[in-house]
Curated annotation (Swiss-Prot):
Record flagged with keyword Magnesium: no
Family designation: Belongs to the RapZ-like family.
Species of provenance: Halalkalibacterium halodurans (strain ATCC BAA-125 / DSM 18197 / FERM 7344 / JCM 9153 / C-125) (Bacillus halodurans)
InterPro entries: P-loop_NTPase, RapZ-like, RapZ-like_N, RapZ_C
Residues that hold GTP according to the record: 65-68
Name of protein: Nucleotide-binding protein BH3569
Residues given in the record as ATP binding sites: 14-21
GO molecular function: ATP binding; GTP binding
Entries under HAMAP family matching the protein: RapZ_like
Keywords: ATP-binding, GTP-binding, Nucleotide-binding
Gene3D superfamilies xref list: P-loop containing nucleotide triphosphate hydrolases
A Pfam family hit: RapZ-like_N
Top-rank taxon: Bacteria
């Protein structure tokens, strides 16, 4: 292997039941060589072995979970060692998968599996203890994905979208609409509240529609306060996004929330995605728009 060639290293971790198996399978499909439960202290030696092999292997994914909970300090030491040895050679990212407690409990009940830390078979006790153990690791993560509302195929799509770029230093802006009544997305870097804007929900013929439809978006965008908000947020993001990119972040998740995630937030997420489409790789999603249709 050419010693100057960069090696992408993704460390997959997170809450038990949050989707690490799907993440591994998705990265394997992208050409990553995946290793499950490698002791963190052996990571530098393992990478040396990979580099000295005759085969070209420049994309690695390593799964670290509670089976190796005593090794988390060694994980940080190994990452720091690799960073110090050659900043230009290793592109290391920690991918942390998370989900709300209630969803994790539901998944354990559906699969009839026991949480690795659960006492007396009570998954919620294990989940709470696991969160405490993983707090520092989550704080070091460059990528956090909330899988609460994601089906396996949706998680796969999200991982492929985040890791399939030809240029791994490319910068992606994820614009996400959501409803505050369903909770703030935990993987958002920035959150903006647009509940102060006039609400199409109170217009009878607009209530069943969404911000993806012209009538609703026209209604939301016609107000003076909407245009003032757009102008101010465009100015703020025009300043902030280049700073995030310069800092070395590979992606930023921007959450725009209204009450139900159906009208105002959807309209504005679509608007800002179009505004910045010529400057950045944009991805827009509407977390709660289907929930809104059901109500």
């Amino acid at each position: 292997m050419n010693v100057k060639e960069e090696i992408d290293i993704v460390i997959i971790t997170g809450m038990s039941g949050a989707g690490k198996t799907v993440a591994v399978q998705s990265l394997e499909d992208l050409g990553y060589f995946c290793v499950d439960n490698l002791p963190p202290a052996l990571i530098p030696k393992f990478i040396e072995l990979i580099e000295s092999s005759s085969g070209k292997m420049n994309k690695l994914a390593l799964v670290i979970d509670l089976r190796g909970q005593t090794f988390f300090d060694q994980l940080f030491e190994s990452i720091d060692l690799l960073d110090q040895s050659s900043l230009s050679k290793y592109n290391i990212q920690i991918l942390f998968l998370d989900a709300k407690d209630a969803k994790l409990v539901q998944r354990y009940k559906e699969t009839r599996r026991s949480h690795p830390l659960a006492k007396h078979g009570l998954p919620l006790d294990g989940i709470k203890k696991e969160r405490e153990l993983l707090e520092d690791l989550k704080g070091r993560a460059q990528q956090i994905i909330d899988t609460t509302d994601l089906k396996p195929i949706q998680l796969r799509e999200k991982i492929i979208q985040r890791f399939s770029c030809e240029e791994h230093h490319s910068f992606t802006v994820n614009m996400m609409s959501f409803g505050f009544k369903y909770g703030i997305p935990i993987d958002a870097d920035l959150v903006f509240d647009v509940r102060f804007l006039p609400n199409p929900h109170y217009v009878d013929h607009l209530r069943p529609k969404t911000g993806l439809e012209g009538e609703v978006s026209s209604y939301v965008l016609k107000w003076t306060e909407t245009q003032q908000f757009i102008e101010k947020l465009e100015d703020l993001l025009s300043f902030m996004l280049p700073q995030y990119k310069r800092e070395g972040k590979s992606q930023v998740v921007i959450g725009i929330g209204c009450t139900g995630g159906k009208h105002r937030s959807v309209t504005l997420a679509e608007h800002f995605a179009k505004v910045f489409a010529n400057e950045y790789m944009m991805h827009v999603s509407h977390r709660d728009v289907e929930k809104g249709k059901e109500r």
